[in-house]
């Protein structure tokens, strides 16, 4: 299952992107920003050489969370809810990619905006697709 998100920033920049893929399983998209054309884009992470869908550049950066994720059986322990580990309420979207055997995580708020270069980009889920 996939989700469509609206990326929006206080500078006025808005762009729709996707996370996940449809029933066919032939693609799995995740939000990235392009440093060449300064835009938000959905990139198919299953492709060997992912590129910006706007300009074709390979100079793209993922919004994937780089955090210390914990197994479900220990994540509820008080010690592990402290800093350096993400909490479930900090997660905007989690989506499992079967082809890569990996969960892609997008955290809530304060992402890098490719237009104003501030960490003020937010994502809002607009709809689900399959």
Feature roles, as predicted:
Residues 1-19:
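Short, extreme N-terminal segment that most often corresponds to the first beta-strand
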Residues 3-8, 28-31, 49-52, 110:
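Residues immediately within or flanking Cys/His clusters that coordinate Zn2+
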Residues 8-11, 34-37, 52-55, 97-98, ...:
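Short cysteine-rich clusters marking metal-coordination/redox-active sites
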Residues 14-17, 39-42, 59-61, 103-105, ...:
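Short functional micro-motifs and their immediate structural scaffolds
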Residues 21-29, 46-47, 67-68, 80-81, ...:
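Short linker/helix segments within small regulatory modules
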Residues 26, 30-50, 57-67:
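Structured domain cores in non-transmembrane regions
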Residues 60-63, 74-76, 87-91:
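Terminal leader/tail segments of proteins
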Residues 112-130:
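Glycine-rich, aromatic-bearing surface loops/beta-hairpins
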